[in-house]
Amino acid sequence: SKLSKRKNPTSINYYRHMGYMPEAVVNYLGRMGWSMPDESEKFGLQDMLDQFDLRAVHLGGPVFDTEKLDWLNGRWIRENLDEQAFANRVAEWAINRDNLARMIPLIKERVEKFSDIAPLLGFMFSGMPKLDTSHFEHKKLDNETVRRILQYSSWRLDGLRHWSRDGLYEELNQLAQGMELKLKDFLSPLFVAVAGSSSAPPLFDAMAILGPDMVRARIRSALEASGGVSKKQLKAWDKDYRLLSAARTEHPE
């Protein structure tokens, strides 16, 4: 697929959170529309600068292949990191002290021993939760409503300029009211989308810490896992969402 927000997250922060090595990402982007004279697939930035020739740039539209990026990142990990370097990179990626300090208040009252932390915060360090339609079953929400919640939330969060706990609460609470749903029911699919489970630390705090790139990507992934949206549905839902947004503008609280 082409590199688009609909199918591939375009923010570099997403790929950092997913655990890609910066060297591998630069390597992969360098290969999009250009190749080394010897056709080697793995190369560093300095190698690329030394060998770059504008005449060798391909005119066709580049295709972003995440499986290829995974393969290339794996090569960088295996071929360029010894055990100590590997440990250092993992620690740098996973144990961000600032983020850890923000997470502690969310789980401290629920922890009786340190080994309890992993199940509570595992979703903060993982990629896309592996979900299917069964994860979104809810006694008060049918599948279409679940998918509308995810799609409308995706649209609303795409337009959110200031990413904060209070801002997220305000926007999603207003959206729940516009859809005439209780906030608890409305948030259920979002818990699953963001954390992979309906049992997780406070959602808005977790979303604020995860950041916009990862949260938006997980919601889009969850929408596909819950059944996706047809073109006909998307057109109808877009019209309904615009009406909800217009009503909010006309009658702000």
Mark where each language-model region is.
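Charged substrate- and nucleic-acid-binding regions of tRNA-handling and nucleotidyl-transfer enzymes
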Residues: 166-236
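Alpha-helical recognition segments enriched in aromatics with Gly/Pro capping
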Residues: 1-77, 188, 192-194, 198, ...
